[in-house]
Amino acid sequence: MNTNSNTMVMNDANQAQITATFTKKILAHLDDPDSNKLAQFVQLFNPNNCRIIFNATPFAQATVFLQMWQNQVVQTQHALTGVDYHAIPGSGTLICNVNCKVRFDESGRDKMGQDATVPIQPNNTGNRNRPNDMNKPRPLWGPYFGISLQLIIDDRIFRNDFNGVISGFNYNMVYKPEDSLLKI
């Protein structure tokens, strides 16, 4: 029995698991309605050289994209369906092709549970109708959209270093269900 071969297979399986877990972490960040956690997500992106594309629209900086996602996209729920990754030899870089699906809250409310069409008044501190964790309305999930996500990430994720590892992020909706209320 060749122990080198076993180590290689074990290493590949471990890398595949780490890559899938990292991808799930990215999707969980996109689904998180808490805007205070935005800083944790920004740290994953390379601050000097990162390309972000969302449905053929480029973004110059990760913070601009993430603020748009937080403020203009309703609550989401992603489900990972497949991850395929390839290491580029000698570059320390991985190319990940991610297949997933996402559904959107079609209740007409934003991520904070407020009516998406009526802005909240900032001086209503005693408003009892304001949602909190206990009485926040539940999302009304629509049908799933198909998503294709391409990531360019550093292989430092295999050494448990996640700061600035994303240098490419290309998020595309490849399937839109006909019965969705959402217009994209």
Curated annotation (Swiss-Prot):
Functional description taken from the UniProt entry: Affects mRNA transport from the nucleus to the cytoplasm.
Gene Ontology BP annotations: mRNA export from nucleus; poly(A)+ mRNA export from nucleus; ribosomal large subunit export from nucleus; ribosomal small subunit export from nucleus; tRNA export from nucleus; tRNA processing
Gene3D superfamilies: 3.10.450.50
Keywords associated with the record: Nucleus, Phosphoprotein, Transport
Compartment(s): Nucleus
Region called Disordered, residue ranges: 111-135
Full protein name: mRNA transport regulator MTR2
One GO cellular component term noted in the UniProt record for this chain: nuclear RNA export factor complex
Cross-referenced InterPro entries: NTF2-like_dom_sf (IPR032710), Nucl_pore_RNA_shuttling_Mtr2 (IPR019488)
Subunit (UniProt): Interacts with MEX67.
Residues the record lists as Phosphothreonine modifications: T125
Compositionally biased residues, Polar residues: 120-129
Pfam families: Mtr2
